[in-house]
Amino acid sequence: MKGKKWFLALAAVLCLMGTAWAGEREIVYNLGIEPRTIDPVLNSAVDGSTVLYNISEGLVRIGLDDAPEPGCAESWEVSEDGMSWTFHLREGLRWSDGKPMTAEDFRYGVQRMFTPENACPFAYVGYFIKNGEECFKGTAKLEELGVTAVDERTLRLDLKHPSPLMLDYLSYHIFFPARADVVEQDPRGWSASGSFPCNGPFMITEWQHNSELTVVKNPHYWDADKVKLDKVRMVMINDVNTALAAF
């Protein structure tokens, strides 16, 4: 699993088979198949990741130089022993429905990864977080997890051990924020319709299952000025010959 910056994924589709221009600021991309899930902590497939990295963003993102750079977090500090990281969210962050984003959304998102009932397939990636492995295996309470929303714009991660790749890991979709008020309505199926608030450069406007998923530019994205596309249509054509004929 690799963290990918949203526009790297979009740039890549321009040189892949199954991609075509459908308008001046719109592209059509062949997703191939219907994503099994686009829940950040349940997804383990490329098709789901393609959608997720276009509609969501974590504390950090991966830049064009393939290195971590500030995403929703504008800055961070590390303790001298490397065991505590404090992230400061950008001012004015909002979800696609206009609701303010807070550090609690990130804390909740990370907690979902280690909730045993969710059986997150990539939870082991986050075992560097204090009590992460223990929470996932049910030997520690989620309240003991080393993730704290200090205030609305400050998130602290306490670690089990220093991790030189931690910033890279934080760009992965398993660390994306989540809205408790949305998820708790249907913990296992909340993302199935696509009608949920997003925090990335795009947001879902239509999902015709097994046919097409459409995303449009998210006006509330903090870096919206750099998003040059208005719409991306992700069609689902599994057969290569059919895909070639369609484009």
PLM regions: where:
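Surface-exposed binding/hinge segments that line
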Residues: 88, 107, 121-181
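N-terminal lobe/hinge region of extracytoplasmic solute-binding protein
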Residues: 30-80, 111, 195-199
